[in-house]
């Protein structure tokens, strides 16, 4: 017969309580600014949504609405193809 260990609450890893208390409310920058379409030539805006290693940051982290996230993905991919934005962190522009 198998024996079961009781789960001890004291041995659980403690979460950082400060990070749970001070969560910033995410909002869509494009909705607030009234942007109709995201342009692939606006490199400064696109770089805000690309991580250090060159990946596109997901909408659940940035707070971008779905319609703008799709436009953002397309714009970043176009800018990469035209060598305006690097594909990875190993390519410096």
Swiss-Prot record:
GO biological process, one term: translation
Keyword Protein biosynthesis: no
The entry's keywords: Ribonucleoprotein, Ribosomal protein, RNA-binding, rRNA-binding
InterPro entries linked: Ribosomal_bS18, Ribosomal_bS18_CS, Ribosomal_bS18_sf
Signal peptide: none
SUPFAM superfamilies: Ribosomal protein S18
Cystine bridges: none
Transmembrane spans: none
GO molecular function (one): small ribosomal subunit rRNA binding
One Pfam family hit: Ribosomal_S18
Gene Ontology annotations for the cellular component aspect, listed alphabetically: cytosolic small ribosomal subunit
PANTHER family documented for this protein: 30S RIBOSOMAL PROTEIN S18 (PTHR13479), SMALL RIBOSOMAL SUBUNIT PROTEIN BS18M (PTHR13479:SF40)
Family: Belongs to the bacterial ribosomal protein bS18 family.
Summary of the function given for this chain in its UniProt record: Binds as a heterodimer with protein bS6 to the central domain of the 16S rRNA, where it helps stabilize the platform of the 30S subunit.
NCBIfam families named in the record: S18
SUBUNIT field: Part of the 30S ribosomal subunit. Forms a tight heterodimer with protein bS6.
Entry protein name: Small ribosomal subunit protein bS18
Species the sequence originates in: Variovorax paradoxus (strain S110)
